[in-house]
Protein backbone atom coordinates (compact mmCIF):
# COMPACT_ATOMS: atom_id res chain seq x y z
CA UNK A 1 0.00 0.00 0.00
CA UNK A 2 1.46 3.32 -1.10
CA UNK A 3 -0.30 6.46 0.21
CA UNK A 4 1.58 8.60 -2.29
CA UNK A 5 0.13 6.53 -5.14
CA UNK A 6 -3.38 7.07 -3.78
CA UNK A 7 -2.78 10.81 -3.44
CA UNK A 8 -1.46 11.03 -7.00
CA UNK A 9 -4.48 9.10 -8.31
CA UNK A 10 -6.86 11.30 -6.34
CA UNK A 11 -5.15 14.42 -7.66
CA UNK A 12 -5.47 13.18 -11.25
CA UNK A 13 -9.14 12.33 -10.73
CA UNK A 14 -9.80 15.75 -9.22
CA UNK A 15 -7.95 17.47 -12.06
CA UNK A 16 -9.95 15.53 -14.66
CA UNK A 17 -13.18 16.36 -12.81
CA UNK A 18 -12.59 20.09 -12.38
CA UNK A 19 -10.98 20.73 -15.80
CA UNK A 20 -14.27 20.69 -17.80
CA UNK A 21 -15.82 23.06 -15.25
CA UNK A 22 -12.95 25.53 -15.54
CA UNK A 23 -13.05 25.12 -19.33
CA UNK A 24 -16.75 25.99 -19.38
CA UNK A 25 -16.02 29.01 -17.20
UniProtKB/Swiss-Prot annotation:
Keywords for the protein's UniProt record, in alphabetical order: Extracellular matrix, Secreted, Transport, Vitamin A
Where in the cell? Answer: Secreted, Extracellular space, Extracellular matrix, Interphotoreceptor matrix
List all membrane-crossing ranges.
none
Q: Cellular component terms, GO, for this chain's entry? A: extracellular region; interphotoreceptor matrix
Looking at the record's lineage, which domain of life comes first?
A: Eukaryota
Q: Does the keyword Cytoplasm apply?
A: no
Where this protein primarily resides, as one coarse class? secreted
Entry coiled-coil feature ranges = none
Role according to the record: IRBP shuttles 11-cis and all trans retinoids between the retinol isomerase in the pigment epithelium and the visual pigments in the photoreceptor cells of the retina.
Query: What name goes with this protein?
Result: Retinol-binding protein 3
Organism for this UniProt entry? Sus scrofa
- Recorded name of the encoding gene: RBP3
Amino acid sequence: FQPSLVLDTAKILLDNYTFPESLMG
